[in-house]
Amino acid sequence: MAATILQTRDLCIGYAPKRRPRVEVAADIGVELLKGELVCLLGPNGAGKSTLMRTLAGLQKPLTGEVHLEGRDLHGLTESERARLLGLVLTERVDVGNLSAYALVALGRYPYTGWDGRLSAADEEVVRWAIDAVGARELAARSVGELSDGERQKVMIARALAQEPAVLLLDEPTAFLDLPRRVEIVQLLRRLAGDRDRAVLLSTHDLDLALRCADRLWLLPPDGPLQTGAPEDLVLSGAFQRTFADVEFDPAIGSFQLAQEPEGEVSLVGEGLHALWTARALERAGFRVAEDAPTCVEIIRDNDDTVWRLHTATGDRVCATLYELVKCLKTDATA
């Protein structure tokens, strides 16, 4: 079994402002992070994800309880010791002036350099490795200010990797990225976690991607204890649905649905990829696919050509596209 790198015991997180009552965000948190794992921290807005990430990173103290990093109390470590064990990538955009991407990544070596900050040949080798690990070699000479959000995020991850940490913590690393870049970053993190000497924990609002990619989920509901398990276990137990009760999740297909008034039922005749995407188009438009429904859609394929024949009580129509098919069904439904 993989070794535990990070562990919490009876952890209570929140804020303790001076001269005011403390604010408890979440309590009774007892979790562990194992080598080789990619873990996603999920929860609604306000549940305390960022507070938990900052507490695990040592940026704020817990109200009560303990955080252990490789068996040692996190707050008993020096700043240099902590930086050698834990790499952190935050959501906030950091102003780094005119630094090149290479120079920014090189800052990750500060726990290992002397008072003058000079890099040794070994340090330079680690910096190049970190840049290559995230696929950013072509970005190394460019100014950080010229990079896109996705490119910049790669460089920030490389900077954390240059610390050679046992744990990589990332707070909303895909928050400002488009879908292809989000997938790219999560695939990168999954590959980095595959290194048995490293664990990766990221908080995210991208629920679909977390369900597909995470080895485990940490679910932080707004009114209950943190729960942990494989994505499939948490769906089967109902914990995932309870945590996100304000959105409609279909456990049969493992994805979120738009809540809408049903337009009617349609039977579907066809197979393969065209049938799959036809069913998706129908469901998106509010029509439930049912085997015995009187309204029927038949997929007719002739070599590379495809049409959809719509059979209704008022007659048959042939539609050249799914857009046309949905428009016809909606017209009939409102007639």
Task: Give residue ranges: language-model regions.
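Conserved ABC ATPase signature
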Residues: 143-147, 151
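Catalytic Walker B motif of ABC-type/P-loop ATPase nucleotide-binding domains
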Residues: 168-171
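Conserved ABC ATPase "signature" region
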Residues: 121-139
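Conserved ABC transporter NBD signature motif
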Residues: 65-73
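Conserved catalytic motifs of ABC-family nucleotide-binding domains
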Residues: 164
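The feature captures the beta-strand-to-loop junction immediately N-terminal to the Walker
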Residues: 42-44
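Helix-to-loop junction immediately C-terminal to a conserved catalytic motif
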Residues: 57
